[in-house]
Amino acid sequence: MPYLANLRYAPEPCRQYLHDIYNSVVLNDVVRRNKIRDVDLLARIVAYVIGNIGTTFASTSIAKFLKSEHRTVAPETVLNYIKYCAEAYLFYQVNREDLQGKQILATNEKYYMADHGLREAVFGGNMKDINLILENIVYMELLRR
């Protein structure tokens, strides 16, 4: 985020700037482009993916959890929302290379943030899950090369 250099590293303006960028990407790019009606569901799914960056997860487990919270959502909807975010360059999808046989059919992709500063916008401080953040930074560096 180049503009952050102009803010002289004051914490609150930086957080506000990151939050505004996050809202712009999610609300303008994803919601409007894909005509999403349940913005709260999208925000929850995006927060889940951001919180579990670099790990595999199943869309069916997300759908089952949301069902236990009295929100009916199909696993395909979860996958579509994540795909829409990837198309808006919020996430990068990485397919696993170690799968064989029928495991290839399962959705076992990992997702990485295009800018881990957006994680700061959603969760605040980054020190709790530093291992996930470092893995994300390494992936982005390898992608850049």
Where are the regions a protein language model picked out?
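Accessory nucleic acid-recognition modules appended to NTPase machines
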Residues: P2-R145
